[in-house]
Swiss-Prot record:
Listed InterPro entries: Hist_DNA-bd, Histone-like_DNA-bd_CS, IHF-like_DNA-bd_dom_sf, IHF_beta
Protein name in UniProt: Integration host factor subunit beta
Gene expressing this chain: ihfB
Role according to the record: This protein is one of the two subunits of integration host factor, a specific DNA-binding protein that functions in genetic recombination as well as in transcriptional and translational control.
Annotated organism of origin: Salmonella arizonae (strain ATCC BAA-731 / CDC346-86 / RSK2980)
A molecular-function term among this protein's GO annotations: structural constituent of chromatin
Annotated keywords: DNA recombination, DNA-binding, Transcription, Transcription regulation, Translation regulation
GO biological process: DNA recombination; regulation of DNA-templated transcription; regulation of translation
PROSITE patterns (UniProt xref): HISTONE_LIKE (PS00045)
SMART domains on file: BHL
Taxonomy of the source species: Bacteria, Pseudomonadati, Pseudomonadota, Gammaproteobacteria, Enterobacterales
Subunit structure, as described in the record: Heterodimer of an alpha and a beta chain.
Amino acid sequence: MTKSELIERLASQQSHIPAKAVEDAVKEMLEHMASTLAQGERIEIRGFGSFSLHYRAPRTGRNPKTGDKVELEGKYVPHFKPGKELRDRANIYG
């Protein structure tokens, strides 16, 4: 599901709210989540999961085109850990 599909689905389920208001709310929520993570804070949504930053240590990688070794710097990457309820609901396909 893309962001625009999410907005369309929410707008159709909440017909009393203008589609533009739904779009603005979704965009604002995602922007707030991104800025919270950028500040190094953790986001927890009970029953859904948590978002945090994990440190990826420096390492030697390879250029896929040339095969040359490339030194990659350490960096923080976003990480999502699903909550138990989400894991249980997703397990109906497994």
